[in-house]
Swiss-Prot record:
GO terms for cellular component: small ribosomal subunit. GO terms for biological process: translation. Coiled coil: none annotated. Part of the 30S ribosomal subunit. Contacts proteins S8 and S17. May interact with IF1 in the 30S initiation complex. It comes from the Bacteria. This is Small ribosomal subunit protein uS12. The gene is rpsL. Pfam families: Ribosom_S12_S23 (PF00164). It comes from Mesorhizobium japonicum (strain LMG 29417 / CECT 9101 / MAFF 303099).
Amino acid sequence: MPTVNQLIRKPRIAPVKRNKVPAMQQNPQKRGVCTRVYTTTPKKPNSALRKVAKIRLTNGFEVIGYIPGEGHNLQEHSVVMIRGGRVKDLPGVRYHIIRGVLDTQGVKNRKQRRSKYGAKRPK
């Protein structure tokens, strides 16, 4: 345990808190326009073609967002809403696109966890 003199000479420093979703600027969601929609491969040991989009946000940030669910209708110039939340096996993907909002359609034939994928209740 340090002495009072040691603490006066070299005070304790609080650890720096890094923001995991800086482009959100403390907002729960942000709107943006897709500049590129493409697929990418995950880190080892996983293997797939994950659907992602590069998005220019209203605050000027350019981020990569993951498109969840099976199938999507996004293309260049689609207006999307994003939320925070990274994809563990895709480096650099820190945001999720919200399905069923703005130009993004919900997932077709979704029976369970519908609210997460913007799917309406089946009749």
